[in-house]
Amino acid sequence: MIEQPVSPKRKYELKRRAEKQAETRRRIIEATVKFHSTIGPARTTVARICREAHVQRATFYRHFPDSALLFEECRAFSLRESPLPDMTSFAEIADPVRRLRSALTAIYPYYRQHEQRMAAILRDADGLPGAGGAFFRFQDRLSELLAAPWKSRGQRHARILAACGHAVDFQAWRSLASRQGLNDRAVVESMVTLVRAAAGQA
């Protein structure tokens, strides 16, 4: 059987349909990110998203039949809009204290800029495993990167890794910066002191 060529009109209709579907999907993602960033994932309902995105429930579920897919798309969207600090530049610094100070100096302004959004999302992380996943993975990788140049083993390595994990933890930064009123430079030096103490350099 010989396939009939698709007419220009049909091609145009298919293209317009795909564009409309992509636009609808984008509106749903943007609406979800908006609510995740303000009231948090736990309070973000399908009804809220549908009202904000101007879609029906059936349309929402056609695009996102499960929450895991929606979380993944929202993570990708957020990281495109507000990418996490690049860790490659820190990895090139051999001195452990300089690497630590450089990394914290880069990430704390990011925390400050996105504090409301991160606080809303991470607040719900315990009850919603999908919330904050990309950021927690970033924290874990960064902690390991900062602990590596100390070249420690055993319990000493465990202490250094834990201290580095605390230093890059958003909630730890928030406690010192927002609640205690320290500026980012002061928080950096406080965390450097903590990690050096864990390494036995206090």
Q: Positions of the model-derived regions?
A:
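Short hydrophobic/aromatic patch on the recognition helix
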Residues: 54-64
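Hydrophobic/aromatic-rich alpha-helical bundle segments in the mid-to-C-terminal region
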Residues: 149-194, 202
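Amphipathic alpha-helical segments that line or abut small-molecule/effector binding pockets
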Residues: 30, 97-119, 188-196
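Hydrophobic alpha-helical connector segments
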Residues: 73, 86-113, 136-139
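Alpha-helical DNA-contacting segments of helix-turn-helix folds
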Residues: 36, 64, 69-78, 118-121, ...
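Short helix-capping/turn signature of helix-turn-helix
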Residues: 64, 123-127, 167
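Basic, helix-initiating cap at the start of DNA-binding domains
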Residues: 1-55, 69
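Short, basic, alpha-helical segments at the C-terminal edge of helix-turn-helix-like DNA-binding modules
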Residues: 46, 75-83
